[in-house]
UniProtKB/Swiss-Prot annotation:
GO biological process, one term: killing of cells of another organism
Organism per entry: Urticina piscivora (Fish-eating sea anemone)
MF GO annotations: toxin activity
Primary location class: secreted
UniProt KW Transport keyword: yes
Compartment(s): Secreted; Nematocyst; Target cell membrane
Protein name: Toxin Up-1
Keyword Transmembrane helix annotated: no
CC annotations in GO: extracellular region; membrane; nematocyst; other organism cell membrane
Record's keyword terms, sorted: Cytolysis, Hemolysis, Ion transport, Membrane, Nematocyst, Secreted, Target cell membrane, Target membrane, Toxin, Transmembrane, Transport
Function: This toxin is a potent hemolysin devoid of enzymatic activity. Its hemolytic activity is inhibited by sphingomyelin but not by cholesterol. In erythrocyte membranes, it causes numerous cell membrane ruptures. It also exerces cytotoxicity to different cell lines. It exerces a positive inotropic effect. Also causes hemorrhage and necrosis by dilation of the blood vessels in the skin, and vascular leakage of fluids and rupture of alveolar walls of the lungs. Is a potent ichtyotoxin. May act as a pore-forming toxin.
């Protein structure tokens, strides 16, 4: 299917980005438990 060839790799890249973002989010969340205000500022700038 031509569409599968066009969109398949992009979907895989999107999934990889989602996983990376998810890991980053969890890392930020872990830091948030210690410094809530600092984390809020950190998230606002990143």
């Amino acid at each position: 299917d031509e569409n599968e060839n066009l969109y398949g790799p992009n979907e895989n890249k999107a999934k990889a980005k989602d996983l990376t973002a998810g890991a980053s989010y969890l890392t930020k969340e872990a830091g948030c438990t210690k410094l809530q205000a600092g984390c809020t500022m950190y998230q606002a700038y990143n």
